[in-house]
Design a protein with these regions (language model features):
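Feature captures hydrophobic
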Residues: 1-139
Length: 139
C-alpha cells in the first residue's frame, strides 16, 4: 500500500521540502548552480513536482501542471522518492535497477546528490512537525 493516499499528501510532504529548499539561504544557491529545471513525475499516487534551479534566478517549485519546460525528467513511484528523502535509496542504484528513470542530462542531477545528504534530517523533522510519524517507518 502506498505511503501517500493522494497527490495532496505528496505535495504536503515532498513538495513542501522542495519549497523549503528553494528558499533556503544556504542550500538554494548551491542547488541553483545546477542550472536546470527538473520535473519529478510520481506514480502511486500520480503527481508532479517541477523545480527550477537556475543560477541568478529565484527558485520555483510547481505542483501538477506547469508552464516550466523541464530539461530533466525523473520518473518513479512516490514511495521511492519518499524513501530517498529518508536516506534509504541510492540514486545510482535505483537508476540501475529501474526504480527511477531519467530523461535528459542525468549528470546534472547526479552532481546534486552530495548536496542532499544534509537534507535527510530536515525531511524527518518536517514529517514529525506535520504529525506524520507514520511516514518515518518507511522501508
Amino acid at each position: 500500500m502506498p505511503y501517500f493516499k493522494d497527490a495532496g499528501e505528496v505535495y504536503a510532504t515532498i513538495g513542501k521540502l522542495f519549497e523549503d529548499l528553494a528558499s533556503d539561504e544556504e542550500l538554494a544557491p548551491k542547488f541553483r548552480k545546477a542550472n536546470t529545471i527538473v520535473q519529478y513525475r510520481y506514480r502511486e499516487p500520480e503527481s508532479r513536482i517541477t523545480v527550477k534551479m537556475i543560477e541568478g534566478e529565484e527558485g520555483q517549485v510547481d505542483f501538477g501542471e506547469t508552464l516550466l519546460e523541464p530539461e530533466v525528467v525523473m520518473t518513479m513511484e512516490a514511495d521511492t522518492a519518499h524513501r530517498f528523502w529518508l536516506g534509504q535509496v541510492n540514486v545510482t542504484g535505483a537508476l540501475a535497477r529501474g526504480q527511477m528513470k531519467a530523461k535528459g542530462p542525468v549528470a546534472k542531477i547526479l552532481k546534486l546528490v552530495p548536496l542532499v545528504k544534509p537534507v535527510f534530517p530536515r525531511y524527518r523533522r518536517q514529517l514529525e512537525d506535520a504529525g506524520r510519524r507514520d511516514l518515518l517507518e518507511a522501508s
